[in-house]
Amino acid sequence: MASVEYLGIDVGGTNVKMGIVDAGTGKISNFYSHDTDSWRQSGHFIDRFGDAVALQLLANKDVKHVGIGLPGMLNRERTVPLEITAIPEIDGLPMVDILSKRFPGTQFFLENDANAAALGEYYFAEEKINENYIFITLGTGVGGAAIINKKIFTGGDGNAMEPGHIPSRNGRVLERNIGKKELLELANLRRSEYTGTTQLSADGDISTTGLVAAAAEGDALALRIWEEVGEMLAEGLASLIKILDIKQVLIGGGLSASFDYILPAIHRTLDYWLNPYYKNGLAIKRATLGNDAGLLGAASLCFE
């Protein structure tokens, strides 16, 4: 007997990625990617999006469930995008209704992309994880989600868990301290102040890849910079852990390559801020889905 398959769609500001996902194994087939901007410039984003969905459903006639991750805020009912900064044309559009009318007999599930990626870790992670966890994505910004009893925590009106906007050091929110752009600004500042030996460039062109590579080779300055990042992240995590009473944290996203170098500072900082109750059972882990997190996360919405 063939296993159930879902269509997962990860809508990003740069590309829209979609593929057929085996619900049992997480294997992705019929992968397709299209640049978001050309659909936007056509003036008919939702129509072009629907055309791509039609091709997938035509080629996979047994697929009756479609999960869609969007980079922004949704209404409480998960049917209408409210604020999608990368694709403002769909703000306020009854997206689920439009797609359901075009594809009768097919169910559509809409969710914030970070929430979807978080849920995907429960269903498709390499190692089985607890039903309750905080999920943090480190990349251009700092995103996140909370999964409670295998369900996405959406808060009162549907858009809870914006960890990047937690107050942090220097009068800034967290993602204005450790988002990619700000991280590199910090690295170049620390390099300009540093008088020791380091392989990091003094020309103001440090990259995240170079910063990780230098740390891997034991570069003292690179390790110090990642330590500072880990401290700031952990200060935010301490609040989330206490507010939600969740002791498992998964860290993913493009900058999660730094995981091994921020982890000691995370543990040390959490040890300072958390009382024994919250330390008991505390686990900080690396998310495992990598580049497939968005697509697998979108497909995981179909389990709900």
Model regions: which residues?
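A charged helix-plus-loop insertion that forms the helical arch/lid used to bind
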Residues: 79-92
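ATP-binding/phosphotransfer module of carbohydrate and carboxylate kinases, centering on a glycine-rich
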Residues: 1-65, 74-80, 99-107, 120-132, ...
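Short beta-strand segments
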Residues: 10, 67-71, 111, 135-141, ...
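Glycine-rich phosphate-binding loop of actin/hexokinase-like ATP-binding domains
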Residues: 128-181
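Active-site nucleophile and cofactor-binding loops and adjacent substrate-binding regions
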Residues: 86-89, 109-115, 135-138, 285-291
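Conserved A3 ("GATE") glycine/threonine-rich loop of ANL adenylate-forming enzymes
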Residues: 14-15, 116, 140-143
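Short gly/Ser/Thr-rich phosphate-binding loop of adenylate-forming enzymes
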Residues: 93-99
